């Protein structure tokens, strides 16, 4: 079976949720004997030099990247008002990338073309023109749902109007795209149910993001910093910013009153300026984490206080694989078949979130039990080889690939 992954960001190094999801699936394809080809936009925002990519991966993945600037800009956002297409989508279309795609399709016959995320569906017309491969959307999220959730909390009238317009266009594009797919691969059953409700009748397969759990279990010698809670995520994704703001505004002061020596560490690239300048007691900001394993092992309790978003939080999978006790909202843990109180703590209201964090800070035995439960759950659910093997079987059995 020959698969082409078309990506909106370079997957290596896998240092954020979406690149981890893309890279790990590709690694799983290769391990399962699938001939993999990767064609990706290498964005200005998330630029990753080809020279830093291991030669073995480049060869095995027939890797090719095309540099493009997908940054949001005022002119593009304004000019888009005179278009019928969502700006969220149009900023991922480039003639240069299309030319590279056409050359790839002319040179190689594929069985499956897997679009990594909705935005790459803008290339479906050219795919259909030059290939007979089955077209599959790997839906990392329900994109319009993220923005519909965000709009409920938007206070600026002008911004709400503009984002409302873009969200409506995005939803129209997302639903129109369904008509041109042969299958969908979702990351959660919740997202699968949304596509089914929207009338998609063709095969849908839920394939959670897998990880190499044995690799995550490797420890480093750094001593754990007691009474530390942390949020570690890409801070150029709006729901993550909202999550940190919610925690700081509604939870942190109450936690600190009950556990005065507690420390909150928020980490992640592209930290917004207003969060860099946060002046709260016992709060530390780390903009760039050089060694994720060291960071996870040093800090005790992981927080995922998301109020919006869709899809799966890869950081929760990573956290569980590292054996971290995690406190999350229900939205944050969507798509994971957790058992509340056994392998994660779920809390949605500020008072419940505060209590969950304080209990773990004060009760070492409870924290240790949650750590064991998280790691055991990760070993059972997230093994990458098993995860991707199931998808390969789906492609062969359902799509005759």
Language model segments and positions:
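A short, well-ordered alpha-helix in the C-terminal region of glycosyltransferases
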Residues: 366-380, 387-393
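Conserved acidic donor-binding segment of nucleotide-sugar-dependent glycosyltransferases
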Residues: 344-351, 359-365
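N-terminal subdomain of nucleotide-sugar transferases
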Residues: 1-64, 108, 254
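Acidic donor-binding loop of glycosyltransferase active sites
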Residues: 182, 294-311, 322-325
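Acceptor-binding helix/loop patch of EC 2.4 sugar-transfer enzymes
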Residues: 8, 75-87, 135-172, 234
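Donor nucleotide-sugar binding/catalytic pocket of nucleotide-sugar-dependent glycosyltransferases
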Residues: 164-167, 171-218
């Amino acid at each position: 079976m020959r698969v082409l992954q078309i990506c909106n960001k370079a997957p290596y190094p896998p240092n954020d949720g979406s690149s981890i999801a893309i890279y790990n699936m590709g690694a799983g394809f290769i391990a399962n004997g699938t001939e993999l080809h990767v064609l990706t936009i290498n964005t200005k925002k998330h630029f990753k030099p080809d020279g830093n990519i291991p030669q073995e991966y480049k060869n095995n993945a027939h890797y090719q990247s095309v540099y493009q600037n997908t940054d949001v800009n005022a002119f593009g956002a304004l000019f888009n008002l005179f278009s019928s297409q969502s700006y969220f989508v149009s900023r991922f279309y480039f003639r240069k990338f299309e030319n590279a795609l056409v050359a790839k399709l002319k040179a190689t016959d594929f069985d499956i073309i897997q679009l990594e995320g909705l935005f790459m569906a803008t290339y479906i017309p050219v795919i259909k023109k030059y290939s007979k491969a089955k077209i599959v959307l790997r839906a990392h999220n329900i994109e319009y749902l993220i923005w519909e959730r965000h709009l409920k909390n938007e206070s600026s009238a002008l911004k709400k109007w503009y984002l409302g317009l873009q969200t409506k266009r995005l939803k129209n594009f997302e639903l129109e795209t369904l008509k041109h797919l042969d299958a969908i691969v979702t990351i959660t059953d919740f997202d699968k149910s949304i596509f089914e409700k929207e009338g998609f009748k063709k095969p849908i397969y839920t394939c959670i993001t897998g990880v190499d759990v044995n690799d995550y279990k490797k420890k480093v010698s750094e001593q754990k910093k007691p009474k530390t809670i942390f949020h570690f995520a890409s801070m150029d994704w709006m729901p993550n910013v909202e999550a940190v703001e919610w925690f700081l505004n509604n939870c942190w002061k109450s936690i600190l009153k009950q556990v005065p020596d507690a420390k909150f560490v928020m980490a992640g690239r592209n930290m917004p300026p207003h969060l860099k300048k946060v002046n709260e007691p016992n709060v530390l900001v780390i903009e760039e984490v050089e060694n994720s394993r060291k960071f996870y092992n040093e800090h005790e309790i992981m927080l995922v206080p998301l109020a919006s978003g869709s899809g799966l939080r890869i950081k929760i999978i990573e956290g569980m694989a590292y054996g971290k006790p995690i406190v999350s909202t229900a939205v944050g843990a969507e798509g994971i078949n957790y058992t509340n109180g056994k392998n994660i703590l779920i809390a949605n209201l500020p008072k419940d979130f505060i209590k969950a964090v304080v209990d773990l800070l004060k009760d070492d035995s409870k924290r240790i039990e949650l750590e064991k439960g998280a790691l055991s759950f990760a070993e059972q659910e997230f093994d990458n080889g098993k995860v991707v093997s199931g998808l390969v079987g789906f492609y062969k059995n359902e799509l005759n690939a």
